[in-house]
Amino acid sequence: MAEEPAPDSERVGQPGGLSVTTTAADGIRVIHPTGEIDHHTCGQLQQALNTLTADRPRVVVDLSRVTFMDSSGINILIAAYKNVTAADGWIRLAAPTTPVLRVLQLVRVDDLIHCYPDLSQALAP
């Protein structure tokens, strides 16, 4: 599955904080945050997730370049899960780093949102 930039692909961010790139792969919106997701930076991830307008949205959040995530990031992922599933879509998490996976497991978000070890598995049907 080749990954290609979405027509509305964008990158938002600030140096030393968080940047977010959005692409598309086989009709699936892929959100690539890079950096730390915390109270000060989480708005960028929220903005990327709030732009989902498709019926039955399919979303993968690639966490492979996220070095830290606090409860702000967890809350955004849970809200996105609720919004996407209410629209008959799905959201998956891909390739969380060890510290991020630990947080997801501690608060049991990985029981709510499917978490895959790499992006290719998260994109698979």
Language model segments and positions:
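STAS-typified acidic loop motif
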Residues: 4-6, 10-47
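Intrinsic-disorder/low-complexity coil detector
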Residues: 4-6, 14, 32, 56, ...
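General small-molecule cofactor/ligand-binding pocket signal
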Residues: 21-23, 94, 116
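Glycine-centered tight turns that cap/initiate beta-strands
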Residues: 27, 109-112, 118
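Amphipathic alpha-helical interaction surfaces in cytosolic regulatory modules
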Residues: 39-113
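A charged, well-structured terminal subsegment
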Residues: 117-125
